[in-house]
């Protein structure tokens, strides 16, 4: 993809700075998951434009520890749909094509309008293409006393 090799690093660096600043300065309350209180990534996006009545969103998503996702990300596309819906720019049934920095894309649609504990929300659908990048085999030792793993609740990042 032309130009990506020369612009990804600054986008990643700015994205990580924005994510850190958001986590330091902003708060939010998720309507159904009270334990989710951090910003995970930053989506840097061009203004929406339309082709044949379909919204087109070009973005780059900077993820920890400072990489650019190869996809437009389902979370990012869902958030963009919700934001555009809240601003009145998209309505129930409207479609959006989310395109990543390398041109991969998701076909997104607002399927339903919801109320989640008093917060207006949407239920999006996201469709795209996936490729097998590897296969893995997981085995359990029959003598392992913790075959299902373990969790120490006081060691998760939001508790430190």
What are these regions (language model features)?
Residues 10-33:
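Conserved phosphate/ATP/ADP-binding segment of small-molecule kinases
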Residues 10-13, 17, 37, 75-79, ...:
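Conserved active-site and cofactor/substrate-binding residues in soluble primary-metabolism enzymes
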Residues 92-134:
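A structural-propensity feature for long, helix-poor, extended segments
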Residues 25-62, 67:
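Conserved phosphate-donor
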Residues 129-160:
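Structural signal for terminal/edge beta-strands and the immediately following C-terminal loop/tail
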Residues 2-9:
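Short, small-residue-biased leader/transition segments that mark boundaries at the very start
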């Amino acid at each position: 993809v032309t130009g990506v090799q020369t612009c990804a690093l600054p986008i990643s660096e700015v994205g990580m700075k924005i994510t850190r600043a958001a986590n330091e300065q902003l708060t939010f309350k998720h309507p159904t998951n009270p334990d989710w209180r951090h910003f995970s990534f930053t989506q840097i996006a061009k203004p929406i434009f339309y082709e044949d009545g379909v919204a087109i969103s070009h973005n780059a998503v900077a993820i920890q520890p400072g990489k650019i996702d190869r996809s437009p990300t389902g979370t990012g596309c869902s958030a963009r749909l919700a934001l555009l819906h809240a601003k009145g720019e998209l309505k129930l049934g409207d479609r959006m094509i989310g395109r990543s920095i390398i041109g991969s894309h998701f076909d997104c649609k607002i399927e339903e309008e919801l109320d989640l504990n008093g917060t207006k929300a949407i239920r999006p659908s996201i469709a795209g293409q996936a490729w097998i990048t590897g296969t893995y085999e997981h085995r359990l030792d029959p003598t392992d006393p913790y075959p299902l793993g373990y969790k120490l609740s006081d060691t998760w990042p939001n508790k430190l």
